[in-house]
Amino acid sequence: QPEMKNKYIDLIEQTFDFPQDEFSVEDNELYFHDIPLMEIIKQYGTPLKITYLPKISSQINRAKRLFNVAMAKVDYQGSYNYCYCTKSSHFSFVLEEALKNDIHLETSSAYDIHIIKALYDTGVIDKDRYIICNGFKRPQYVENIASLINSGFINTIPVIDNKEEIDLFTDVIEKSCKVGIRIASEEEPKFDFYTSRLGIRYNDIIDFYKQKIKHNKKFKLKMLHFFINTGIKDTAYYWNELRKCIS
């Protein structure tokens, strides 16, 4: 009769390819990037969350390399701009590490705009940085985005999620600014969650642009943003959505 596997290491080994590059085992103790985790646990206890800062920069630069190679293959003449989404981690040490890599920022809520201002006040970013403002625009979020734009953050780009939002910004923007439009993509068949509550439908985008943006001196359309609920997969669904977006 085979031996019953009931240890945590058994679960790890049958679930993951282990050990991975970051991990090693020495004398039955786990090391992470040559850092003895048991020593840290003895000092700080558990549960414990560790942020390994060098990994942030390596992953950002990996993404840049992948895009640069792909762009070179098709002779794409544009540029790739990596934007770090602040909601993935609000910790200052994470943001400061990420921003060492010539990147830009994406916000999702009113709270995030305070982070942008704090980064500027401490000299970590300047007013030329791209600030992509996604998410549903509640009144405080609209007010905070406008305060950024009105104070000279020239590359702050609110992404319009519904037709009413553009009027909210018209009322509070004192200068001209760039805007984006979020496209409402179709859901993948059999997907359990409905995530296209935000965005403007393909068929409405041109009319919306002509009516609300084209002749409004406060706005210049800079971006079309579309969100695919399952991320980038090599499937007919993904490529069909992409074709609809760019055609």
Predicted regions and their residues:
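A charged N-terminal "starter" segment
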Residues: 1-177, 181, 206-210, 214-220, ...
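C-terminal active-site-proximal or functional interface alpha/beta core segments in diverse enzymes
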Residues: 8-10, 230-232, 237-247
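Active-site-proximal beta-alpha loop/turn segments in soluble metabolic enzymes
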Residues: 184-197, 223-238
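Flavin-dependent oxidoreductase catalytic cores
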Residues: 186, 195-210, 240-244
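Domain-scale recognition of functional cores that engage charged ligands
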Residues: 202, 215, 228-229
